[in-house]
Amino acid sequence: MFLGALWLLLLLPLRPPGAQGQEADEPTPWPSVKGLKEQLRKAGALSKRYWELFSCTLWPDHCEDQETPVPPLGWSLPLWGRRSLDVLTAWLCRFQDCCSGGGDCRISNNLTGLESDLRVRLHGQHLASKLVLRAVKGYLEMPQVGKALALSFHGWSGTGKNFLARILMDNLYRDGMRSDCVKMFISTFHFPHPKYVDTYKEELQRQMQETQWRCHQSTFVFDEAEKLHPGLLELLEPYLEPRSPEARGVEAPRAIFLFLSNLGGSVINEVVLSLLKAGWSREEITTQHLEVPLQAEIMEAADSSFGSSGLLKKHLIDHFIPFLPLEYCHVRLCVRDAFLGQDLPYTEETLDEIAKMMTYVPEEERLFSSQGCKSISQRINLFLP
């Protein structure tokens, strides 16, 4: 039915047969009854050509396999026919992304840009930058994947967990966090009431299934993961489990899961402080210093179900990413970036003054910003003319 309507719509604006490119004001007699069969054959061929042009406009990669080009027709492709084709194409592209080079243009996977952004925009997190880049790059470059990639971000508030997630989305997807292929859930906002957990489970599963059906590469971000209900954590397990051997020969959609949590922030700070006091530089701190104490604190947290969930017990989390506490020099860089981001002038004295407004702990050493880089944009407003 759709093809029939398309055929009629495209044939309505056609001119009578005549010379190639003949103008409308040059009349040509219609064919006799004896030539009607031939003209109908040409009409069918032209309709087929319209459909091929229409489909190639939407799915150009499907046209590369055609062995022989479509032979030229006796009728030209009229202006109004071309416009009809453009209208139909634009209408369908409202519901499906159409790319000039084929593929899914919603997905960019700009790993070079990701590496650059992590180096320039994310301050004081050499471990997180290196681990995330290596994990994501390795996952995306695999010919076939055996499971979803699961990364768990841990650290104090304001250390850059959400910021890194946003950088990642900006480089993997054309529309960043607003992409159809990205879903973000905040525990206290999307799942606030335990008594409605069954409803939350149905809605979460529906959104995840729809997103994976719509995108061959999707990302799900769970902020405040330590506050997720046990029922929701259990629901996520099948999505993170390795694929069965029988299904590994079939190409599966890729999925990235990011869990953002404050769990482990205290032990990360303690380890970093002790290493700095012992004479280590910040850049000399490795994952080996933090991996064991971080996972121990996560699993022993009494006020969270995350550590006791099947996600950890079944080893479904691929990497635990530590975010180190930020020092004065990092906060100062955040202040500078905030000015630059708003295209505002600043002085070195202003950067120092705003950075010193933050609270630093522990009380004796005053090394780490207790809020990280949070609230800096609000503090900048105090210095505007």
UniProtKB/Swiss-Prot annotation:
Oligomeric and partner information: Interacts with TOR1AIP1.
Induction of its expression: By interferon-alpha and interferon-gamma, in spleen and liver.
Keywords for this protein: ATP-binding, Cytoplasm, Endoplasmic reticulum, Glycoprotein, Nucleotide-binding, Signal
A GO CC term assigned to this protein in UniProt: endoplasmic reticulum lumen
Protein encoded by which gene: Tor3a
Gene3D superfamilies cross-referenced by the UniProt entry: P-loop containing nucleotide triphosphate hydrolases
Residues engaged in binding ATP: G155, W156, S157, G158, T159, G160, K161, N162
Subcellular location(s) of the protein: Cytoplasm; Endoplasmic reticulum lumen
Main location group: cytoplasm
Keyword Cytoplasm belongs to the record: yes
Similarity section: Belongs to the ClpA/ClpB family. Torsin subfamily.
Name assigned to this protein: Torsin-3A
InterPro entries: ClpA/B, P-loop_NTPase, TOR1A_C, Torsin
MF (Gene Ontology): ATP binding; ATP hydrolysis activity
Signal sequence interval, chain numbering: 1-21
Positions of glycan attachment: N110
Organism: Mus musculus (Mouse)
Record note on modification: N-glycosylated.
